[in-house]
Amino acid sequence: MTNANVDATQLTTKPSQDGFYMPAEWAAQQAVWMIWPYRPDNWRSAGAYAQATFAKVADAIGGATPVYMGVPQAFLAEAQKVMPSHVTLVEIDSNDCWARDTGPTVVVNAEGECRGVDWGFNAWGGHNGGLYFPWDKDEQVAAQMLKQHGFARYSAPLILEGGSIHVDGEGTCMTTAECLLNANRNPDLTKEQIEALLRDYLNVKQFIWLEEGVYMDETDGHIDNMCCFARPGEVVLHWTDDETDPQYPRSKAALDVLQNTVDAQGRKLKIHLLPQPGPLYCTEEESKGVTEGTGVPRTAGERLAGSYVNFLITNDRIVFPLLDPATDDIAAQKLQDIFPEHKIVGVPAREILLGGGNIHCITQQIPSGK
């Protein structure tokens, strides 16, 4: 266990000026970060079920990549009991456990040096539809993770969650208008100004804008639940053939965009369709274990934004959520077809979904650089 309570060195330049860029998720990784779940107003039984699930996810990742977990001081003893012994526990305070969204985006240069981008965070909407208050501890998470690795830090003047962007490492950024252009994120910035900041801090050239993400996604439609890059020129899209399902028009609109765009290298995209599970709904029993607080209520009968696209690529593994016995095997086979060189590892992940996300949302990779 280590302590990361000191800020990382802050830079005054921008990554693109310094020759740094965000690599694709399939680039070599030196670590993956997670954060301990404990909010009783978001996780049933004060996080007990989620903690067991996070341990399984950490174990699956640990077969390919070292895992670090940020844990508030009060929960360190409990985390040591629950987490696999290979996980490095780091004392970090947080309001909740979404490492993808509160952690840093690590950028690299041609020499293999790593630095981190620390985005602004307002709990997915601040006082205009945000998911909890306060979020002051979450705002400090990225700097503490960067300090753990000794990486210098860029502070980006943009409210942005890591789950709202995907890159191919070759100049293309994919995102959703539903999230990035939402009035509850950066209301004073135009689309062009947001693109300019992403060019500065991710060092990308081309943008693929999907209109919306997954139906009922409380993050306002994060791209990482809807569509991701599999490799340069290839994407994986959340899909349903059921034209009566509220997800269908969203996925169909996304498909239309993807079929009629090119990436930063001028390539037409190969599109893999990954079928959605369910539909899945929160049960009475599951909602009962969540206490009232400042978090968004978890209501019985509410549709869950389940998606197999919410997987993590980490070195030679794909760690993906098992969500529905009727479709889990189909998803696993499809992922194996898309990633023939990778080991496909499924982890039962309904418990993460009940809290509002999935495996990609609770992880943040640290690229090797070299």
Curated annotation (Swiss-Prot):
Gene label: aguA
Family: Belongs to the agmatine deiminase family.
Record GO biological process: putrescine biosynthetic process
Molecular function GO labels: agmatine deiminase activity; protein-arginine deiminase activity
Name the record gives this protein: Putative agmatine deiminase
E.C. numbers: 3.5.3.12
One Pfam family matching this protein: PAD_porph
Active site: C361
Keywords for the protein's UniProt record, in alphabetical order: Hydrolase
Disulfide bonds: none
This protein's record includes keyword Cytoplasm: no
